Amino acid sequence: MGKKNRKGKENNAAKTSFLKVENIKNTNSGLELPSQDYTNVEEKESSPKTDFPLITKEHVNTKTDSNILDYPTIGDLVSSVEKLCVLKELKIAFPEVDDTLIKAILIASQGVLEPAFNSLLYYSSPEENTDFALPMKPISVEDYSKINVSEILQREIFDDIEDEFSGQGINGSMVISKIESELSSLAEHIGNISTPGSNREVAESTRNVAVAEGHNTILSNEDSILKGKEKGKEEEKEKGEEKGVNSLKGAAVKVVAKSLKNNRIPVTVKRNEPSNNLFDVLNCDESEEEEEQDVETNTSNQERKNQGGNTEVPEAQRDSADRLPAKDDGGYKSAFGTDSCGLFAADAKDEKKQVHPSRQELSFT
């Protein structure tokens, strides 16, 4: 009985150990052992396929190696930078900076102008950072589309007008206000402008109107200045003529006063026209002689004044000058001689025959 029990225990221990080995073998599903036997073909086909991670790792490594070979070298970057037009522009803008530094900055900025320019600007003057820097973010098309086209045209027109009138020294604020009103009226009639051709035409027309108004204002100012000058000249001329007339009037008054003082009224005779009056004919030569006597008396009075003597004419001379011509037997005699005009004969015998018939004819006619 005892031997049988021992044999049964040994058999049980062998069975348990065999089961343990099978469990260990079954836990490693990824490994295939040659000692493993499959009972059926279906179980072999249903078993999972094994993967080889080492093989996959080697395949990944080959891909990374190919990518590393595709990267450019420093020489490739330098050669690509040297072909850029930006390099020439930066050399012109910063002649004091070394070429290698400019190329290095272009490589760092990946060939973009704005960051390269700003970095070189800081390098050239690090203490003075007052220069204008280029914007790093370019303006997109969407941002530009938000701006109204009419506003851009107005700004361009105003800039052109300010440039034109600043050279002429004219204040363009009034003109700009007029243009703004005109643009508003045009916008009401035309509406929002979309095509660039119509925008250009409107801009040119408004600009021409503004320039024409500016020239008209200049011409009106010049005309007003010229009219003022001409008016001043005419006023001066009128004043001069009034002064001349007043001086002539004063001289005439002096002559009349002088003649009244001397109790003589000057008689003017038109010698070119024939006279029917007998006394005009008789006084044809007396007026000239009286003028000569007046001149002589004036000169004598002036000499007496200079000598300090009396300037008054004696009464005897005045009486002789004021006396009427007297009749004489020798014919008609004037105050200055006999028959001065040559109308009467000098013989006294023929006086009644020649003078009286003429008087009768004059009385009857």
Swiss-Prot record:
Which processes are annotated in GO (biological process)?
Answer: ascospore wall assembly; cell division; ubiquitin-dependent protein catabolic process
Per the record, the major location class is membrane
Cited function: Involved in the pathway that organizes the prospore membrane (PSM) during sporulation.
Q: Write down the CDD domains for this protein, in alphabetical order.
A: CUE_Cue5p_like
Family annotation (InterPro entries): CUE, Cue5/Don1_CUE, UBA-like_sf
Tell me which SMART domains the record gives.
CUE
CUE domain residues are: 82-125
- Compartmental location: Prospore membrane
Keywords, alphabetical: Cell cycle, Cell division, Meiosis, Membrane, Sporulation
Domain of life of the source: Eukaryota
Q: Which Gene3D superfamilies match?
A: DNA helicase RuvA subunit, C-terminal domain (1.10.8.10)
Where is this chain compositionally biased, Acidic residues type? 286-295
Q: Which gene encodes it?
A: DON1
Q: Mark out the compositionally biased spans (Basic and acidic residues).
A: 224-244, 315-331
Alphabetical list of Pfam families matching this protein: CUE (PF02845)
Protein's name according to its UniProt entry = Donuts protein 1
